[in-house]
Amino acid sequence: MSRINLVTTEQANEQQLVLFSAIEQQIGIVPNFLKVFANSPAALQAFLGLHSIASEGDLDTKTKERIALGLAEQNACQYCVSAHTALGKGAGLSGEEILANRAGSSQD
C-alpha cells in the first residue's frame, strides 16, 4: 500500500519550516496530520487559511470543541476524536460532556 510520509523538521525546506513555525506559535506543536499536509506546502497553506476562517466568529472555544467532537465521531475519525478530546479537556469540558458531545448532545 502506498503511504504518504510525514515531513519532519529535519527534512523540511524553508517554506515548510515557515509554516511549521506559524503552527507552533498558534498551538504549541505541529500535529502529525499537518506534517503530512506539508508534502504540499500549498495544501498546508490552504488548510491553515480555512482553519483561520473557522476559528473566527462568536462561538467560544468550548462550543467549537463540542461541535468538533460531534463531527469527529460522525466521521468515525479516531485521530480527530482523540485530538478534540484533548483540546476539549484543555478548554474545560468534563469527561461526561465530551461523551455527550460525541453522541451528538450536550449537558450544557
Name each region found by the language model.
Residues 1-108:
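Hydrophobic alpha-helical segments
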